[in-house]
UniProtKB/Swiss-Prot annotation:
Any GO MF annotation of the entry: metal ion binding
Name of the gene: secA
InterPro entries linked: Helicase_ATP-bd, Helicase_C-like, P-loop_NTPase, SEC_C_motif, SecA, SecA_CS, SecA_DEAD, SecA_motor_DEAD
Cysteine pairs bridged by disulfides in the record: none
Annotated source species: Ruegeria sp. (strain TM1040) (Silicibacter sp.)
Entry protein name: Protein translocase subunit SecA
Entries under SUPFAM superfamilies matching the protein: Helical scaffold and wing domains of SecA, P-loop containing nucleoside triphosphate hydrolases, Pre-protein crosslinking domain of SecA
């Protein structure tokens, strides 16, 4: 019998069905234009782009241009790649243009889909960013799709790490730019540390199309991107504390597997206090609860987490003497990514590797806040519907499930639940053997390196040939994936095989042709390809007859999306396939999150050894457990975002102010206002409002004016004059400070002083923002405890961070004013001393490099050691003294 909800959906259709239906007239319009665009010459396609560009700039809406633009891209792709986009691909592209997430299954051609909205939105001249999860995909997609964009008369760029600056700048100026989410985020942070606007890469954030959007905007959402600098080396402290952890008993700590937390018990705290006193890390009479002990307690907690929560070969691997993290969602290594707040160092101490120094944060942003900078955002993935609520609530993105071009023929079996892990693995091996014997390719999915290697040993014992794909063997990934769909192939893979991999039945034809050419370089490539294609077609037919790719998973992940990604490797483009999950009561998800009802159901059935429970109720119960975990993780991400939003508002203010300063030719008004505000603050401190003259601290004001404004003002004498009030003293100080700064303008020249002001402003903003980030980090780490006092941690954080921000701005004004009041040109004596140092340094350089490059002959009347003969070099020219430095960093340096 149908439920009420199901019945209503059958009658009225789902919201998703209605969205699909609404695009059909648009797709019909694009299809109707096809003959017209097929008739265009290659130049005609480019001319069409120019026509559409002019119309877009003239104000015609992109929605109105969409049918012609999509028809143009379809024709360009057909000519450049030999691929004609399906109607479902046009549909996916339309939803992306509308600012949605298009959920498209594996093998449906998402890479080509992105070209349609990218082209349409690039017509405005504001640029489009296509975002991928790794550099391999960014480079591959850029190289592949640049043929389409080139045929359309558009430019394509790619962004990657360690890219030369000029190349990166050119890539950002292209119509369409492919990049990884990490590199985009880091470039944004670097841009906001640059000294001038012409060095900034990301001029605007117009439209981003995010591939594997759930991975980037949900799985990575809690991970901040951090640009950091070195802090003090404390490796000895980590090593000392690490030795304490193995001495703990189980009663000294409690592990909460649901929240991945571990805490000391009262008994553990007492033991810890004694151990720290013996180790000399706590002074006699000191307690763990003293404020001075906060740092030690923090490091002990991190060491406990490193030992009890982080497992080698699951959460990280040790490679070439370094601790390298593993992404829990993709199973890939994350070189360069480090855990913060001393946790990474604690793991290094545990593993006995070199302990890298801690870092201090220079700038940071989360992906949630970075991608919300874009005027328009959209995304593609094979699995998004389970997180539709989060996409809508946090990013304002709708999710549309785009129908497949051909119906899915894959069979998804009910889960098989065994009592023990050993019984489960035995059943998987037996099933693999049966499939292998009939030639059906098998993909065995695991959640960790350890489990993938255990399955590998079991297969070896049975004499079954197989490949293993995990973070240890990531270099062979492309080859292993290419062969995973071949006749009788058996592949064990961690979550690495779950995303961005396309397993083709019969194997990858391009790789087969390449290998055949390497083996026989003298052969005719066309003949060889025809031979390989014939063999491939025959092998593919046998694989299809055997049932297509069989995906077996060794356990369910906390997230249904990860399970669905693994399922999606099978049954691409209407191919047959089969998926099955093998579970046991010892699995993490079953043990930690399985409901009591499920436990009772299974124990009441009296399972025999090797017997499995297979029932839709079990699936439903597990999915409820997964939904519960997903809901909890969503709440955690929302909570992190609420706190990060507070910092984000401040970040936007600081970065916007910084950009304004970089863009400004004259910052004189800004620094003058700052200086006058500093004077106002000094008057308020030493001559508080509504006080009498005999209550003023005039000596304190005089000393502070000398310190902060570099003025010897006789404030004490002024205050002693008859009838002088605080306002008159303020005016005299303003006049004196204005006069001092006017003298500096005269000494340096208007342009020179403007450059100094801009430099001091930017450097001080950067330094103060760094300090502020560190303060906010500390506040964030302790504010949670306010909840025990019945105070809302978020409100406490908002209020205190705002006060800290105001204090930072006050400190910024003071520092800028103080530094500018002390700049001066170098004296003749200082210049002579500098020239002597230069001459000595040049002598050493000549001695060290007698065969130096030839230098340009000096001009007539020019004496290298006499600045009076140098004329008026520009600040950015090479210094005439021959040091090789810019003039502004050498003899033109400011004192």
């Amino acid at each position: 019998m149908l439920g009420i909800g199901t019945l209503a959906k059958k009658v009225f259709g789902t919201p998703n069905d209605r969205k699909i239906k609404a695009t059909r007239p648009l797709i019909a319009k694009i299809n109707a234009l096809e003959p017209e665009f097929e008739a265009l010459s290659d130049q005609g396609i480019k001319d069409k782009t120019e026509d559409l560009r002019k119309r877009a700039l003239a104000g015609e809406s992109l929605d109105d241009l969409l049918p012609e633009a999509f028809a143009n891209v379809r024709e360009a792709a057909r000519r450049a790649l030999g691929l004609r986009a399906f109607d479902t691909q046009l549909m996916g592209g339309t939803f992306l243009h509308q600012g949605n997430i298009s959920e498209m299954k594996t093998g449906e051609g998402k890479t080509l889909v992105a070209t349609f909205p990218a082209y349409l939105n690039a017509l405005t001249g504001k640029g489009v960013h296509v975002v991928t999860v790794n550099e391999y995909l960014a480079k591959r997609d850029s190289e592949w799709m640049s043929k389409v964009f080139g045929a359309l008369g558009m430019t394509t760029g790619v962004i990657y790490s360690n890219q030369p600056e000029a190349e990166k700048m050119a890539a950002y100026q292209c119509d369409v730019t492919y990049a990884t989410n990490n590199e985009l985020g880091f470039d944004y942070l670097r841009d906001n540390m640059k000294p001038s606007l012409d060095q900034v890469f990301q001029k605007q954030h117009n439209f981003a199309i995010v591939d594997e959007v759930d991975s980037i905007l949900i799985d990575e959402a809690r991970t901040p991107l951090i640009i950091s600098g070195p802090a003090e080396d404390r490796s000895e402290l980590y090593e000392t504390i690490d030795k304490l952890i193995p001495t703990l008993d189980e009663g000294h700590y409690e592990i909460d597997e649901k929240t991945r937390g571990v805490t000391f018990t009262d008994e553990g705290n007492e033991f810890l206090e004694e151990s720290l006193l013996k180790a000399g890390l706590l002074e006699e009479g000191a307690s763990l609860y003293d404020p001075e002990s906060t740092t030690i307690v923090h490091h002990v907690n991190q060491a406990l987490r490193a030992h009890k929560l982080f497992q080698r070969d699951k959460d990280y691997i040790v490679r070439d003497g370094n601790v390298v993290l593993i992404d829990e969602f993709t199973g890939r290594m994350m070189p360069g990514r480090r855990l913060s707040e001393g946790l990474h160092q604690a793991i290094e101490a545990k593993e006995g590797t070199d302990i890298q120094p801690e870092n201090t944060t220079l700038a940071s942003v989360t992906f949630q806040n970075y991608f919300r900078l874009y005027d328009k955002l959209s995304g593609m993935t094979g699995t998004a519907m389970t997180e539709a609520e989060e996409f809508a609530e946090i990013y304002g993105l709708g999710v549309v499930e785009v129908p497949t071009n051909r119906p899915i023929a894959r069979i998804d079996e009910d889960d098989k639940v065994y009592r023990t892990a050993n019984e489960k693995y035995a059943a998987m091996i037996a099933e693999t053997k049966l499939a292998h014997e009939k030639g059906q390719p098998v993909l065995l999915g695991t959640t960790s390196i350890e489990k993938s290697e255990l399955l590998s040993q079991l297969l070896q014992q049975e004499g079954i040939e197989h490949n293993v794909l995990n973070a240890r063997h990531h270099e062979q990934e492309a080859k292993i994936v290419a062969e995973a769909g071949r006749l009788g192939a058996v592949t064990i893979a961690t979550n690495m095989a779950g995303r961005g991999t396309d397993i083709q039945l019969g194997g990858n034809i391009d790789l087969k042709v390449m290998e055949a050419l390497e083996a026989n370089p003298d052969a005719d490539p066309a003949v060889l390809r025809a031979e390989e294609e014939a063999k491939h077609a025959e092998e593919k037919q046998k694989v299809l007859e055997a049932g297509g790719l069989y995906v077996m998973a060794s356990e369910r992940h906390e997230s249904r999306r990860i399970d669905n990604q693994l399922r999606g490797r099978s049954g691409r483009q209407g191919d047959p396939g089969r998926t099955s999950f093998y579970l046991s009561l010892e699995d993490d998800l079953m043990r930690i999150f399985g409901s009591e009802r499920l436990d009772k159901l299974l124990s009441g059935l009296g399972m025999k050894e090797g017997e499995a429970i297979i029932h839709p109720w079990v699936n439903k119960s597990l999915e409820r457990a997964q939904a519960k975990v997903e809901g909890r993780n969503f709440d955690m991400r929302k909570n992190v975002l609420k706190f990060d939003d507070v910092m984000n508002d401040q970040r936007k203010v600081v970065f916007a102010q910084r950009r304004e300063i970089m863009a400004s030719d004259d910052t004189h008004e800004i620094v003058t206002d700052m200086r006058h505000e500093v004077i106002d603050d000094l008057i308020d401190i030493y001559m508080p409002p509504k006080t009498y003259a005999d209550q003023w601290d005039t000596q304190g004001l005089q000393d502070d004016v000398r310190e902060k404004l570099n003025i010897d003002a006789p404030v004490v004498e002024w205050a002693a004059e008859e009838g002088v009030d605080d306002e008159q003293i303020r005016e005299r100080l303003v006049e004196a400070s204005d006069k001092l700064m006017a003298e500096k303008v005269e000494a340096f020249g208007q342009e020179g002083m403007s450059n100094i002001e801009k430099q001091v402003l930017l450097q001080t903003i950067d330094a103060k923002w760094r300090e502020h980030l560190l303060t906010l980090e500390h506040l964030r780490s302790v504010v949670g405890f306010r909840g025990y006092a019945q105070r809302d941690p978020l409100n406490e954080y908002k209020n205190e961070s705002f006060q800290l921000f105001e204090s930072m701005l006050d400190s910024l004004r003071e520092t800028v004013t103080q530094q500018l009041s002390r700049v001066r040109p170098l004296s003749e004596e200082e210049q002579r001393e500098m020239m002597m140092q230069m001459a000595a340094r040049q002598g050493m350089q000549r001695a060290a490099a007698p065969a130096a490059e030839p230098v340009e002959a000096p001009k007539e009347g020019f004496v290298e050691d006499d600045p009076s003969t140098w004329g008026n070099p520009s600040r950015n020219d090479k210094c005439p003294c021959g040091s090789g430095k810019k003039f502004k960093h050498c003899h033109g340096r400011l004192g």
